[in-house]
């Protein structure tokens, strides 16, 4: 990917924040998503938002059953987008990927991690960065139901989970997906967790995430009294403390340190046996450049794109106010080359 940030957006923070809030996400009409609810293996649910081309949207709209809707989209390639921390199909990158998918004649789907679709999930759990088991059943359902090839991209947290899944599946992943990609993913969770907990990051990004995550966690406590210590959660001031109190114990980890170590994809990248792309920006405020994987530590199936600029899932391009299609276009080109 050849990319240089526009002169009017210097620095990783501006490239991150402006891209998310102000840059254009699509060329024509805003992508329209239509929702299906899937029952999980543990009898919970996830919501999957499909964005399809107009000629297919009518077919999907008429479908009454979720699986019927999945099968109604023909043999076009399917791009599955796993969102980032507290993301959704409304995130700037999700709409941009959907727009790029449409321009290529692809179908796009955004499965929401539990509790991220606007409705709290049922079980005594949420989602986490290393949940390759969740990625597994979701991708396998897509592969079974969809007649065409399946590709997957994960953004930030979703990309780490996707790469963990690819590593766990090994050569079997080729039976499910043609290729995978991670974008600005914290493949070393400890390094990224500490980076986001300091200085400007702590004051801006950490506060933003906690404003969303803490109320959802408290609703989860109302659902399941005694699940965790309410006072300790309210005292959490960074993601480490939040993960220590909520994310780690609810998902089978001893504490935040254990979670960050075991969930990180970086130590497992050499096990990936499906075409995979790991795209990062060296000025990403969330991810120290020294924590990024190097060619010698990944397998032959993993391609590393490490760009000088772009911020965290930003990569704005063009004259003011800019657009964010350059990154999805480049990632889609990589995935298309695997078909």
What role is predicted for each listed range?
Residues 245-268:
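Active-site nucleophile elbow and catalytic-triad environment of alpha/beta-hydrolase enzymes
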Residues 53-55, 72-122, 137:
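Short, surface-exposed "cap/lid" segments of acyl-processing enzymes
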Residues 310-339:
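Catalytic active-site module of serine/aspartate enzymes centered on a nucleophile-bearing elbow/loop
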Residues 146-250:
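Alpha/beta-hydrolase-fold enzymes
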Residues 272, 278-280:
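Short beta-strand/loop motif that positions the catalytic acidic residue
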Residues 16-55, 62, 66, 316, ...:
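N-terminal cap/lid segment of alpha/beta-hydrolase-fold proteins
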């Amino acid at each position: 990917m050849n990319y240089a940030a526009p002169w009017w957006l210097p620095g990783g923070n501006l490239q991150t924040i402006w891209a998310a809030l102000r840059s254009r996400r699509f060329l024509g009409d805003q992508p329209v998503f239509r929702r299906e609810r899937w029952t999980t293996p543990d009898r919970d649910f996830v919501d999957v938002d499909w964005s399809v081309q107009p000629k297919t949207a009518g077919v999907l709209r008429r479908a009454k059953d979720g699986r019927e809707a999945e099968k109604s989209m023909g043999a076009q390639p399917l791009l599955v987008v796993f969102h980032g921390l507290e993301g959704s199909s409304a995130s700037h990158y999700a709409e941009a990927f959907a727009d790029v998918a449409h321009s290529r004649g692809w179908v796009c789907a955004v499965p929401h991690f539990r509790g991220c679709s606007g409705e709290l999930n049922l079980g005594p759990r949420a989602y986490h960065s290393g949940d390759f088991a969740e990625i597994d059943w979701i991708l396998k359902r897509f592969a079974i139901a969809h007649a065409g090839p399946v590709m997957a991209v994960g953004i930030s947290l979703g990309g780490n989970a996707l790469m963990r899944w690819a590593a766990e599946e090994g050569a079997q992943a080729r039976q499910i997906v043609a290729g995978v990609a991670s974008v600005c993913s914290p493949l070393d969770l400890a390094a990224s967790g500490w980076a986001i907990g300091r200085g400007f990051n702590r004051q801006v990004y950490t506060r933003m995430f906690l404003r969303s995550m803490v109320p959802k966690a408290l609703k989860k406590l109302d659902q399941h009294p005694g699940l965790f210590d309410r006072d300790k959660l309210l005292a959490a001031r960074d993601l480490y403390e939040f993960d220590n109190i909520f994310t780690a114990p609810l998902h089978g980890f001893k504490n935040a340190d254990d979670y960050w170590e075991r969930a990180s994809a970086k130590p497992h990248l050499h096990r990936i046996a499906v075409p995979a792309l790991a795209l990062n920006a060296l000025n990403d405020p969330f991810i120290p450049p020294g924590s990024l994987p190097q060619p010698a530590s990944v397998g032959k199936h993993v391609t590393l794109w490490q760009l000088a600029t772009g911020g965290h899932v930003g990569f704005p391009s063009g004259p003011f106010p800019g657009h964010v299609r350059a990154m999805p276009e480049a990632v889609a080109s990589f995935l298309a080359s695997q078909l």
